[in-house]
C-alpha cells in the first residue's frame, strides 16, 4: 500500500493559500479518479484509490501543518505502510512559482510540516514532491504563506497540475522514483 500526504491547514480561511498546495493537489487528483472516502478517527480526510491492484491512501491531515506528523504516523502504523511507499506533497518557498522538484529523501528545509513528519517518523527517508510557491522578501513568511494568493500566482503555482497528477499516478503504479526524478526535475 502507498500513502500520499497532501500538506495544508484545515479551515476555509486557508483554502487558497500557498501553504495549502498539498490539499489542492490531492483534490485535483481525486477529481480525476474514482475513490472511496474512508471514515476514521485519525484527524485526517482519508481517501482510497485502487489502480490495477495498487492500493493507495491519499490524506489531508486536519491538524495544523506543524502537527502533520502525528497523523502520518497513525496512518502508517494502522495500515503498515513502509516509509519508502510514502510521498509527501509540499509547498517550497525556495522554488519559483509552479516549479516542481521530486526528492527521494532529505531534511525539512525550514518547512514545519516536513519537520514534524521527520520528527514523528524518526526518518528523512520518505519521498517528496515539492511545488514552488516562491518567496516575497517584503512580507513576513507566515503572512506570505497563509494569505490567499491572487489569480496570477494561483495560475503560476498550478501551471503544472496535469504533470503533478501524472507524477502521482506513476508513483502509485510503482514507476521507479529515480526515473521520475530524472524525467521531471530537469524539465519542470
Curated annotation (Swiss-Prot):
It comes from the Bacteria. One of its GO terms (molecular function) is peptidyl-tRNA hydrolase activity. The record marks 91 as: Stabilizes the basic form of H active site to accept a proton. TRNA binds at residues 14, 64, 66, 112. The active site is at 19 (proton acceptor). It is an enzyme of class 3 (hydrolase). Keywords: Cytoplasm, Hydrolase, RNA-binding, tRNA-binding. One of its GO terms (biological process) is rescue of stalled ribosome. SUPFAM superfamilies: Peptidyl-tRNA hydrolase-like (SSF53178). Pfam families: Pept_tRNA_hydro. Coiled coil: none annotated. One of its GO terms (cellular component) is cytoplasm. It is found in: Cytoplasm. InterPro entries: Pept_tRNA_hydro, Pept_tRNA_hydro_CS, Pept_tRNA_hydro_sf. Belongs to the PTH family. Hydrolyzes ribosome-free peptidyl-tRNAs (with 1 or more amino acids incorporated), which drop off the ribosome during protein synthesis, or as a result of ribosome stalling. NCBIfam families: pth. Monomer. This is Peptidyl-tRNA hydrolase. It comes from Aster yellows witches'-broom phytoplasma (strain AYWB).
